[in-house]
Amino acid sequence: MRIVFCGTSSFAVPSLELLASEFEIALVITQPDKPAGRGQKLTPPPVKQKALELNLNISQPEKISFLKEELLNIKPDIMIVVAYGQIIPKSMLEIPTFKSLNLHGSVLPKYRGAAPIQRALMQGEKETGNTVILMSSKMDEGDILSVESIPIEQEDNYEKLSNKLSIKGAKLLKDTILSWVSGSIKPIPQNHQEATYAMPILKEELRICFKTSAFSIHNKIRGVYPNAYGVSGDRNIKILKTNIVEKDLNLKPGELFYDGKSLFVGTGDLPLEILEIMSLKGKRVSGKEFAMGYLNQVKKFY
């Protein structure tokens, strides 16, 4: 089985690794290297790093349409797309003998789009999963070949949940490929009336508005982990982990309070206990450590 694999983010890495151990990967298509970090150093995407480690052929086109002729020459049996980041023309999706499959990190038709895991957490969902679809010209609207659900745990944040889904999704994808090629599964159309959408996370969404509910703030912190922040004066301080407290501490939104054991912040309704936060020196610390070291400098978030 000759596979062309399209993927970019760390979510796609377990799928590439597992498929490479079972099948022939004729080509890995991934996004171009991009500047990253404080030094803005040109950095290869996670899929490229894994493909280099596996000694696979790699292509990084600015537009995937540039590779149509190469795809025709490769004559793949199937194309697999996992967190790639570009719209692939229908004419290319239909080149492989068994067409093109996509692993998506939600139970479709819920959370179609670029940020399904983040948005599910931000909405406080109790369950999510993976879906493998037969790709169509419209994003995430293809017929369903397989689906698997998992519970969202209280301790899950974006990093933890994405990691779990990527590992489970790799196995689901491998099993689905074998079933699809053997003809033992049939595509099931999605119910488009039940579709919801997971739009990309905007920079302005990372800032916490403490006038909103404790539920929405707590789930934002989980969903965009580790990037949600509160503003105090000229400081942006990342809050990494919280717990909703079912008692009235009479705190105004953004007001900080330390009771000698725990650090709390006021919201639009219930207080939040801050369990983990970035110190003013950029180090991860507990709420208690932050209170003992910085509460004289940071008394309120705005």
From Swiss-Prot:
NCBIfam families hit by this protein: fmt
rRNA processing keyword on record: no
Enzyme class: transferase
Name of the protein described by the UniProt record: Methionyl-tRNA formyltransferase
Catalytic activity from the UniProt record: L-methionyl-tRNA(fMet) + (6R)-10-formyltetrahydrofolate = N-formyl-L-methionyl-tRNA(fMet) + (6S)-5,6,7,8-tetrahydrofolate + H(+)
Coiled coil: none
Entry-linked CDD domains: FMT_core_Met-tRNA-FMT_N, Met_tRNA_FMT_C
HAMAP family: Formyl_trans (MF_00182)
Keywords: Protein biosynthesis, Transferase
Keyword presence, Secreted: no
GO MF entries: methionyl-tRNA formyltransferase activity
InterPro entries: Fmt (IPR005794), Formyl_trans_C (IPR005793), Formyl_transf_N (IPR002376), Formyl_transf_N_sf (IPR036477), Formyl_transferase-like_C_sf (IPR011034), Met-tRNA-FMT_C (IPR044135), Met-tRNA-FMT_N (IPR041711)
GO cellular component, one term: cytosol
EC numbers on record: 2.1.2.9
Residues the record lists as binding (6S)-5,6,7,8-tetrahydrofolate: 106-109
PANTHER family (alphabetical): METHIONYL-TRNA FORMYLTRANSFERASE (PTHR11138), METHIONYL-TRNA FORMYLTRANSFERASE, MITOCHONDRIAL (PTHR11138:SF5)
Pfam families, per the entry: Formyl_trans_C, Formyl_trans_N
Family as reported in the entry's similarity comment: Belongs to the Fmt family.
Summary of the function given for this chain in its UniProt record: Attaches a formyl group to the free amino group of methionyl-tRNA(fMet). The formyl group appears to play a dual role in the initiator identity of N-formylmethionyl-tRNA by promoting its recognition by IF2 and preventing the misappropriation of this tRNA by the elongation apparatus.
Lineage start: Bacteria, Pseudomonadati, Aquificota, Aquificia, Aquificales
Gene name for this UniProt entry: fmt
